[in-house]
A protein has these predicted regions:
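Active-site/acyl-donor-binding loops of N-acyltransferases
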Residues: 2-9, 66-67, 124, 128-157, ...
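A conserved beta-strand-loop-helix scaffold within acyl/acetyltransferase catalytic domains
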Residues: 2-73, 116-145, 149-261
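Short glycine-enriched loop/turn motifs at secondary-structure junctions
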Residues: 21-22, 78-81, 280
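A general structural signal for short secondary-structure junctions and capping/turn motifs
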Residues: 42-44, 102-105, 136-139, 276-277, ...
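Short, high-confidence coil segments that cap the C-terminus of an alpha-helix
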Residues: 47-49, 106-110, 224, 279-282
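A gly/proline- and charged-residue-enriched helix-loop-helix capping module
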Residues: 78-119
């Protein structure tokens, strides 16, 4: 028999004999799928969690929500590379997701899940489960994800395939920049990163406390790769990566605008790419979301991220939204001729 529950108590979930291990680093190979990530979002970013859980025997399906003004939405923010449901590997797990969709219809008429991947089938799985349960699903591209699949290449082989201007920059500027790659958290280096970030082209940091807590935890677990670049003894560029499950994740990077002429960001990136490829032996690198032009110099694949708007079509509150959506679609068709 399928049991369905909703909880805001993440400590209770952590102590659960089935869910605690399922949502731990032992079972999940990316930080965004773990309970610790959601706990940090709650503690530092003000996102109140609501976990929707369906379970039967040793199988479970978990949809991590936070409540927005229009209903549940993905428990995620700008630090999250992608959002997806977490399921056990048993054959009953997809049916549990459908059971959740049916139960959610009792109390909600609209759910928005942004940042969903589909290279792993996640968006399609959620769409199918909710449609079977009587929901309408509207899928739209909302972001892009730049990635690199190494396919056995070492760093030098990878570098030889980079654009000529980038390789020229690295050849000319590498001798002018001193770089270090740390595999542990260092408070002094982190302070330098925060100082560099404040003088960079980047917008104001959304939650410095979240980022530092994450870096400290990843450092303690041995997954942190913290890069720092100096010119003339002054720290001028810094980057934060993590490595796990055969993938390196590029979380943050910044350089001082005053040092732009010596390309410290590119030189530091090269050092980190070399480290994760030749030392950590990763099979892939994930540059997160956003279509920044510089990502194309380093990455080779672009994957879409989707927003799923899940709607109960019979709910009157959804009719204006559905009418506007239909008009937008008609306008697109008319524009195509």
């Amino acid at each position: 028999m399928i049991a369905i529950a909703y909880t805001r108590d993440l400590k209770e979930v952590q102590s659960d004999a089935l869910l605690g291990p399922l949502l731990s680093a032992d079972r999940q190979g990316a930080p965004f799928d773990r309970l610790a990530w959601w706990q940090a979002l709650e503690q530092h970013c003000g996102l109140t969690p609501l976990l929707a859980i369906a379970r039967e025997g040793d199988d479970a399906a978990v949809l991590p929500f936070t409540l927005g003004k229009d209903g549940p939405r993905a428990l995620a923010n700008w630090y999250t590379f992608r959002f997806r449901p977490i399921l056990t590997n048993g054959p009953a797990a997809p049916a549990l997701l459908t059971a959740l969709a049916r139960d959610l219809a009792r109390t909600h008429s609209r759910i928005v899940l942004s940042g969903m991947p589909d290279e792993d089938g996640s968006a399609t799985l959620v769409e199918r489960a909710f449609r079977v349960a009587g929901w309408l699903s509207i899928r739209e591209e909302c972001d892009t994800n730049h990635v690199l699949t190494l396919q056995g290449r070492d760093y030098q082989t990878y570098l030889s395939g980079r654009p000529g201007p980038l390789r020229t920059t690295l050849k000319r500027k590498s001798g002018k920049v001193d770089v270090r790659v740390l595999t542990h958290f260092d408070p002094a280096i982190w302070a330098a990163y925060e100082d560099i970030y404040a003088e960079s082209w980047k917008p104001e940091e959304g939650s410095p406390a979240f980022l530092r807590a994450f870096a400290e935890a990843e450092g303690a677990a041995g997954r942190l790769r913290l890069g720092i670049a100096h010119v003339g003894g002054e720290p001028v560029a810094a980057q934060m990566w993590t490595v796990e499950g055969g993938t390196a994740f590029i979380h943050k990077l910044a350089h001082r605008e005053s040092a732009k002429s010596v390309s410290p960001g590119s030189v530091l990136s090269a050092a980190l790419f070399r480290h994760v490829i030749d030392v950590d032996l990763v099979s892939g690198i994930d540059f997160g979301t956003g279509d920044n032009p510089y990502k194309r110099d380093w990455m080779e694949l672009v994957r879409p991220r989707y927003s799923l708007t899940l709607i109960r079509p019979a709910a009157p509150r959804n009719w204006p939204f559905l009418a506007k959506f239909a008009l937008r679609r008609l306008a697109r068709w008319a524009k195509r001729g």
